[in-house]
Every structure is written in structure tokens, then in C-alpha cells.
Amino acid sequence: MPSIFAYQSSEVDWCESNFQYSELVAEFYNTFSNIPFFIFGPLMMLLMHPYAQKRSRYIYVVWVLFMIIGLFSMYFHMTLSFLGQLLDEIAILWLLGSGYSIWMPRCYFPSFLGGNRSQFIRLVFITTVVSTLLSFLRPTVNAYALNSIALHILYIVCQEYRKTSNKELRHLIEVSVVLWAVALTSWISDRLLCSFWQRIHFFYLHSIWHVLISITFPYGMVTMALVDANYEMPGETLKVRYWPRDSWPVGLPYVEIRGDDKDC
């Protein structure tokens, strides 16, 4: 059995040809397509600084984890090692768990918690730790955990979309879902239609997934920030802005605070 540190010790291999450009980098494009994580992470920390000061400084942890995902993903695609796969998936799990803890509206908490966020954070932390430990024994556990969280987030977003009349929030949800759907299509196509893409010499769908998901996450985070503000920041008005300019057709969203606890 190969070492978990060894090149190509992971059972996962993507459609891109291995070691095509360097004997040190297994998947060249899949490795370097993670660079946007290191650009958007610090930029979003800067743009969201006033909001984080008001809401919670733990928001910075989310963006640090976002950059760690980029780092571990680079390591995984560079080596295709089992350790790299685990680190990549575990970092995603902790990112989602952190976002859950900060932005999950209390009305979606399990009823036995009575809307207590501190207890909810403990529950999420314990669940994430257990899932992390189990992933070393059974790597498929992480996949189930990630899919469960993703489906629950999608459910919450759909519920909030139905309830809100806020045009900015509805627009953000629509853009986030479209970006996520296109990114997921790229990921699935790379996995299931690899033989077709190899025949036409197009190996870049997983790289496109990296770029799209690195853009989708800021949209998703700002979406959850707006949803959260409805319940946790009464009296504050959040305005969605876009970097570098609001007038540009494409931009990176963030919230500006310009300033009725609400029920689900």
C-alpha cells in the first residue's frame, strides 16, 4: 500500500493528463487554477471589514479557511496524494461548518436548541470534529457530510428566496445558484464524460470548476450575510456593493452597512 504522502496515492484522478508540463506537478491546470482563492480571500477580508467589525470577527476565519482550501487543493492536484485529497475535503468541511455557525438563522436551528446560537456552534463544532476523524478511517464520510450541508444550505436559500421581497437579495440568490449550477456541471462533466473531453483534447473543466467556485463563494457569503441581517442585525441597513465598481457588469459583491427582529 503506497504512503498517503506518495504521488498518485489517491484513488481520485481527474481528466487532465498527468505530468504533462512538469515532473513535479501532476495536474498543471488543475493546480494553478486555484490562484483566485489567494486573490479573492484577502480582497474579501478587506471589503467585508466594516461588516465583520459589526457582526462577528469570526468572519475572518471563514476567509482564512477559503484560502486554505486553495492551498490544499493546489497540493492535492500537484501530487494526487491521498493526504492532499483528505486535506482538501476537510478544509471545505470546516469552511462550511464555520459559515453555518455564523450565518444560520436561528429559526432553522433544531428545536431542542431553543434558538441558542452558542449551543448550535458547539453542535456544529462537535459534528465537524467527528466527521473529520471519521474521514481518516472512511474517506467517504466526508463526501456524505459535504453533500448533506450543501443540500441543507440550498434548502434554506430556497426558503428565503420565497419569503423575501428584497430585490438585491433575490438577485444575489439567482446569480449564486446559476454560478453554482454551472460550476457543478463542469465538475460532473469532468468526472463522467472524461473520455469525450479527452477525444477533443479539452482537459480544463475541473480547472473551470475551481475558478467558478472561487467566484460563487463570495456571492454565497454575501447572500447569507443579507439573510442573517434580517434576523440578527435589526435596525441596520445593508447595501450590496460590487468591486471594483457598481456600474460594471461583473464584480465581486460585498456589503456596506448604512444604518425589527424578524421571525421565520
From Swiss-Prot:
Q: Which residues cross the membrane?
A: 28-48, 58-78, 82-102, 120-137, 139-159, 177-197, 207-227
Q: List the ranges whose topology is Lumenal.
A: 1-27, 79-81, 138, 198-206
Activity regulation text = Inhibited by sphingosine. Activity is Ca(2+)-dependent.
Which reactions are catalysed by this chain? an N-acylsphing-4-enine + H2O = sphing-4-enine + a fatty acid; N-tetracosanoyl-sphing-4-enine + H2O = tetracosanoate + sphing-4-enine; an N-acylsphinganine + H2O = sphinganine + a fatty acid; N-(9Z-octadecenoyl)-sphing-4-enine + H2O = sphing-4-enine + (9Z)-octadecenoate
**Topological relation to the membrane, as annotated:** Multi-pass membrane protein
Question: Binding of Ca(2+): at which residues?
Answer: D13, W14, E16, N18, E27
Cofactor(s) named in the record: Zn(2+)
The GO cellular component terms are: endoplasmic reticulum; endoplasmic reticulum membrane
Cite the EC number.
3.5.1.-, 3.5.1.23
PANTHER family according to UniProt: ALKALINE CERAMIDASE, ALKALINE CERAMIDASE 1
Protein name as it appears in the record: Alkaline ceramidase 1
Give the organism, scientific name.
Homo sapiens
Query: Which gene specifies this protein's sequence?
Result: ACER1
